[in-house]
Amino acid sequence: MFPSQHHKALRRTLQRSYLEVIPAKGIKEKLAVLPQGAWVAITCSPTKPVEATLDLTEQLDNRGLRLIPHIAARMVRDRSHLKDILARLDAMQIHSIFVPGGDKDQPIGDYSSCLELLQDMAELGHRIPDVGVAAYPEGHPSIDNETLTEALLAKQHLATYFVTQLCFDADLIMGWLADMRARGLTLQAWLGLPGVAERNKLLATSLRIGVGDSARFITKQ
């Protein structure tokens, strides 16, 4: 049994956790069970335009949810497109967005990295209080670890928090976090944990996005 203070801490953590969804058919109805004030992140798919994310965000805007739309850098065409996106977000009074590089192999426009998009966001100006970026405790399938570390540190003056990639190993996450704190990372941390999903689908997704050793460990259990 956990001590009572651990139960309280776990309850607070779960109350502040957020659900990540894709802009798919029927998702609005499935989210109807969530209480007001629940955190919901809306992903940006490489197979759909960023407008699909914005459309779903607008459709959910009157539900009393705390919405966090994802704006993937490689899905934004140019500075003019970014300006339009920011205008839509400002009109909804969105309080937080998440800005990954994106899973698309080739950018559709001028932005190949999250940092480039964040820099233009800062120059254009916006009213979004919190901006999140991605972090990879287990590395990335196409980027070496030192480059990932340097990029995360370079982005932190343009962001307010980071979200770790899905990971199944608590010790690995905590060790990585301690190392990054020692290297100067001060942003608030949101830890990526696996949700309810079919085992094979979850493992396939994990390996595709770069979750390595901890996912392979799960396959043996």
Residue ranges and their predicted role:
Residues 2-34:
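N-terminal basic/disordered segments at the start of proteins
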Residues 10-11, 28-36, 54-66, 85-94, ...:
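Acidic (Asp/Glu)-rich catalytic clusters
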Residues 15-23, 42-47, 70-79, 132-146, ...:
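Active-site mouth loops of central-metabolism enzymes
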Residues 19-25, 110-136, 184-221:
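Active-site pocket-lining/capping segments in soluble small-molecule metabolic enzymes
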Residues 25-31, 48-59, 76-84, 104-122, ...:
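Active-site-adjacent beta->alpha loops and helix N-cap segments on the catalytic face
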Residues 37, 47-48:
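Long, contiguous binding/interaction regions
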Residues 142-157, 162, 172:
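Active-site glycine-rich loop that binds ribose-phosphate moieties when present
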